[in-house]
Amino acid sequence: IYKWNGNEATATRKDVFTEGPWCVHGCTGTEITVVANAESQILVQCTKNEKDFGAKLYKPEDAPWGYSCVGKFGNVAKRRVNTIFDHDISPKSNMVLGEVLNDRGNWSGYLPHRHPQPETYFFKFDHPEGFGASFVGDQVFKSTDESFSAIPGGELHPQAVAPGYQMYTCWMIRHIDGNPWLQTDRCEDERYTWLHDAEF
C-alpha cells in the first residue's frame, strides 16, 4: 500500500517479468509511506531537486511495454521497453525511470550508444543463476541477479543476457542541469551504424 499526501493506493506485482510497474513519484518534502502486507522489494530512486511538483502514482497501464529492434541486427537485440517517467512526462523532475526485458540471449542498449547524462542499471534474472554482460566503455562486467551497473556520462553501454535466461533491467538516468536526457538524444557509435542497413 502506498500512502502520500492523503492518498492511498494498493499495488501488487507478482514479478517484474510478467506484470508492469507501480511507482509513486514526488518532489523534495513529499512524505511517502509504504506498507507491505507480504515480503516485498521496493526500489528507491532519488536525487537533489529544488523544484516543486505534485506527487503522482504511475500504474502498469501508464507504462506499457513496447518491443524494440524486432527483426534488426539478426533479430538478437529484441527487448521490451517501458518508460515510467521522463522529461516529457514529468518535466520538473531531475530523473528518468524505465524498465527493459531482454529476450533470452538478446542484447539491449544496442546499437552501442552514449549520452552525457549518467545512468544506473539494476538487474534481475528469471533464474537466480542467470547472468549477462554489462559493457561500460571498454570495461565489461558480469551482470548477476540483483546486481547493478553504474554508467558515467559519455560512456558506451550496451548490455547482453546469456541464452536461456530473461534479464530485467531497471534503468535510471539523472538529468544534467540545463541538459535533460530526452528520448531523441540517443547517440549511437558511428562505427556500428552500418548495421541498421545490413541484412543477416
Kindly give the residue locations of the regions a language model identified.
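Short, conserved beta-strand element in jelly-roll/cupin
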Residues: I1-W4, V100-R104, H115-S143, A150, ...
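Double-stranded beta-helix
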Residues: E39-R80, V96, F135, C170-F200
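A short glycine-rich, His/Asp/Glu-containing loop-to-beta-strand
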Residues: G71-T120, F131
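Generic detection of short hydrophobic beta-strand segments and adjacent strand-loop junctions
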Residues: A9-A11, F141-T144
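Secondary-structure boundary elements
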Residues: T33-E39, P91, D126-G130, Q139
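Short, structured patches in soluble enzyme cores that scaffold and shape functional sites
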Residues: T28, A36, V44-K48, F85-H87, ...
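Acidic, low-complexity central loop/insert segments
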Residues: Y2-A63
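Conserved metal-binding segment of the jelly-roll/cupin
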Residues: F17-N37, T47, K142-G164, C170-R174
